[in-house]
């Protein structure tokens, strides 16, 4: 169904069964598949292809030649009706690709809200991207990667399958991430290694001086104490009792499967 207030350019193809919300804009030469939902106020500039079982929220801006919901590149994929879900107010720039999930990975590729996906960024099958993240030009997420809120991934950076990028992380450009990056950390290189805490980013987001100090102390326990991760976990958990921001580390440890960058 196409809402009466939506605009669909005469050269665009919106297949029967698609849902186009109020005040949405489907620009020239766009293709919208039959199982696609486009939310209120979302704009497809031109030459955008959205197919598969894909739901896109409201007030997104999607630029030319982006491809969303296409068949993934997992050789095990056999045509199952797996999905893509995208939240609200995202800016998805030229030639971004976001692939549908796989049955083996839960069947869903999910992008939250208020993200900036720059030119040529790639989000593979079964990835989860949180809110207010930035993927710079040519950043590439392999399958099953998780990117937590406020993370920034630099241009030309590749993230290995099943890795987790923690909240408020900043990964420098041209990096290769092969293990999990704990929250608040700056990482750079191939293979990516830690370079301290993202202090400037935390200041901009309103973290108190005391909270930043506690986060730095947790970082030092992980990377500079000479102890194993299992040895420092109780100390970090104790620190989190006073500073809730530190709890992001303990939650992260419970999710990590690939080990931490070193």
UniProtKB/Swiss-Prot annotation:
Which Gene3D superfamilies does its entry note?
Hexapeptide repeat proteins, Udp N-acetylglucosamine O-acyltransferase, C-terminal domain
* EC number(s) reported in the record: 2.3.1.129
**Which pathway does UniProt place it in?**
Glycolipid biosynthesis; lipid IV(A) biosynthesis; lipid IV(A) from (3R)-3-hydroxytetradecanoyl-[acyl-carrier-protein] and UDP-N-acetyl-alpha-D-glucosamine: step 1/6
Write out the catalysed reaction.
Answer: a (3R)-hydroxyacyl-[ACP] + UDP-N-acetyl-alpha-D-glucosamine = a UDP-3-O-[(3R)-3-hydroxyacyl]-N-acetyl-alpha-D-glucosamine + holo-[ACP]
Q: Which GO terms describe its molecular function?
A: acyl-[acyl-carrier-protein]-UDP-N-acetylglucosamine O-acyltransferase activity
Indicate whether Chloroplast appears among the record's keywords.
no
Q: What class of enzyme is it?
A: transferase
Q: Where in the cell is it found?
A: Cytoplasm
List cellular component terms (GO): cytoplasm; membrane
Q: Does the keyword Nucleotide-binding apply?
A: no
Q: Could you tell me which Pfam families the record lists for this protein?
A: Acetyltransf_11, Hexapep
Q: Which residues form a coiled coil?
A: none
This protein's UniProt keywords: Acyltransferase, Cytoplasm, Lipid A biosynthesis, Lipid biosynthesis, Lipid metabolism, Repeat, Transferase
- Name the Gene Ontology biological process terms: lipid A biosynthetic process
Q: What does this protein do?
A: Involved in the biosynthesis of lipid A, a phosphorylated glycolipid that anchors the lipopolysaccharide to the outer membrane of the cell.
Please give the subunit comment from the record: Homotrimer.
Q: Which family, according to UniProt?
A: Belongs to the transferase hexapeptide repeat family. LpxA subfamily.
Annotated protein name in UniProt: Acyl-[acyl-carrier-protein]--UDP-N-acetylglucosamine O-acyltransferase
Encoded by which gene? Answer: lpxA
């Amino acid at each position: 169904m196409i809402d009466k207030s939506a605009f669909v350019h005469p050269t665009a193809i919106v297949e029967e069964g698609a849902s186009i919300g109020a005040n949405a804009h489907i620009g020239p030469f766009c293709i919208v598949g039959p199982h696609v939902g486009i939310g209120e106020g979302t704009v497809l500039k031109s030459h955008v292809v959205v197919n598969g079982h894909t739901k896109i929220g409201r007030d997104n801006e999607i630029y030319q030649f982006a491809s969303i919901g296409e068949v993934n590149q997992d050789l095990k994929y056999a045509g199952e009706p797996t999905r893509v879900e995208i939240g609200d107010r995202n800016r998805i720039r030229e030639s971004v690709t976001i692939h549908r999930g796989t049955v083996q990975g839960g069947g869903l590729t999910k992008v939250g809200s208020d993200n900036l996906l720059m030119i040529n960024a790639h989000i593979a099958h079964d990835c989860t991207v949180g809110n207010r993240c930035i993927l710079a030009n040519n950043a590439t997420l392999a399958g099953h990667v998780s990117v937590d809120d406020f993370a920034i991934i630099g241009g030309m950076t590749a993230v290995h399958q099943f890795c987790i990028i923690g909240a408020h992380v900043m990964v420098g450009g041209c990096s290769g991430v092969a293990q999990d990056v704990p929250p608040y950390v700056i990482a750079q290189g191939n293979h990516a290694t830690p370079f301290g805490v993202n202090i400037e980013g935390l200041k901009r987001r309103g973290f108190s001086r005391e909270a930043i100090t506690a986060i730095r102390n947790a970082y030092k326990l992980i990377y500079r104490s000479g102890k194993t991760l299992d040895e420092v976990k109780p100390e970090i958990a104790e620190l989190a009792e006073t500073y809730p921001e530190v709890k992001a580390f303990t939650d992260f440890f419970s999710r990590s499967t690939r080990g931490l960058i070193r």
